[in-house]
Amino acid sequence: MNQKFKKLTAISLAALLGLTAAPTSAFAQSFTEIEQASLTDAISTLAQQYAQSFEEFEALQSGIHEDMTLTLDDAGRSLLGFFFPVDISWFKDVRLSADISMEENAQFMTAGVYMNDTKICTLEYFFDLENLEIYMRIPELREGYIKVDYEEALNQQKAILEQQQESMEESGEISQATEDALESMENSAFSDPEFIKEYMKFLTNLPEYMPEAATTETILNRYSSILFDHIRNTEASESEILDFSGISEECTIYEGTLSQTDAQSFLKEVVDTAKSDEEIKEILNALDDSLYESFMDALKDTSENLNEKLEDDGSHISAKAWVTEDNKVVRRSLTLNETDEIIPVYDWMRITDENRVYSSLSIGPEDEGFQISGDGVIENNILSGQWVLKTGSRDYDAESGEVPAQADWITINVNSYDTTAVKNGCFKGSYSFGFPSVISAEASPEENAANNPLASFLLLLDIDSDRDSGNVSLSLTNEGISLGSINIGANLGVTVEKPDFADLTEVYDSMDEAAMNEYMSGITLDTILNNLVESGMPEELLMQLLTGGTAEEEALPEEEMNPEAAS
């Protein structure tokens, strides 16, 4: 089978199977009837979530509050103490607490920086998208704003790079890094001020450019129907028992195949339908005036390529569905069946026995792709269990302890996954990620430990999200002792103070040397330094950081701490 057609149709089928990767109910008559009914349900659910996302976007646009916190525990501070010759026993956490909002012509962010729950300073960042001007301020340093003209800053950076390049060429030296940076600037769309304006306008008015949920649902159903029209059903095979981890279900296998000529016919119909698809035309024209024209040119080129006569060598794509007696689809697979080999593309399975569940997913050939499999128990809609993620052919026999010379896998313990919340688009769960302690069955425990320094570490992930808020926490433990964590939380619909750019006073142009000298002359560090000391930072360490010297150096004189005092 022609490689282009095999890959394109396999990707199309895999994407559709991915949408239906859930235990679905279907009246079992043929593969196409089963999977088309399942896909229609999946598309309907997707369209509902898509429509709901527009409401969430409005809340996001009005304002969002974010907290990002890095915490070090006692063991983490002790570990870092081996690498850094400074006292960090006083440090507990650092946090950035920000309020962010977007409008068509502006972005606003006001953030507080905290250390050990003590506020150190405030960061203000405003982006005037209409004039492409950025305003920044740290009021604890100085009340005035630094203004950066986006276009002028790009031109200045480009001029510096060009000057460096000319200087190196004169001296006979060539800097590949400088050449790459220049080429990147010239080719980047973000170097074009007009593109920046249009891009930000698109982001802040996203719902206006995107199709309605009903339109999206219609388009997805239209083109998936074309695919199923070209899949040939084979007779259902005898029943097969899926038995994993003591969980078993008896199923009937239904198969659909797509030959080389069928794949070509499918792609031709997709192209021909897309050429006259008014809904696609409306969507693309809403995004960009020239996008639909480019799309039609691409369809024309594809149509010409599809007119090539293909030799049918008997190879085909095979898709299978395992259906239980109560018409649940519990397994799906997709393979490329060549004349001399069968290449796995996708295999998903989920079988249950009362409150027990086994699930697996594999992508690609066994020696090249990845596989994840495991089992757990659902109680009160909460799933707990263990899954193993493997790359390549890395089979591990837990009973015999036999492992290959090199094992690449991660154990995933699911401690509490809310199976009800996810149906409403919310994610709630607690997970831990570990690495195998055995690298080689022939090696001693000491050798295994030496070859796998990560065996004693665990990554702990906690997710708790609702429609208007969310929190993600990632922590690291060693031998069960916490080292530290990163926590990110957000709340939608927060009111953000939005200044009028025309009303901003005491503005200093970053491109004006005299203005910047005036700005620097009025900076005072008193407030920030006092806040750092109040947070618990030792004064000796503070002086060391300021001077770049040692903790034994003398304290800075008053005039260096406060330039205004010197004047």
Model-derived features: positions:
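Cytosolic-facing loops and C-terminal tails of multi-pass membrane proteins
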Residues: N2, A21, I372-G374
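Bacterial N-terminal signal peptides that target proteins for export
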Residues: N2-I11
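Hydrophobic helical h-region of N-terminal Sec-dependent signal peptides
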Residues: L13-L17
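Subset-of-secretome marker
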Residues: F27-S567
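C-terminal segment of classical bacterial N-terminal signal peptides
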Residues: G18-A26
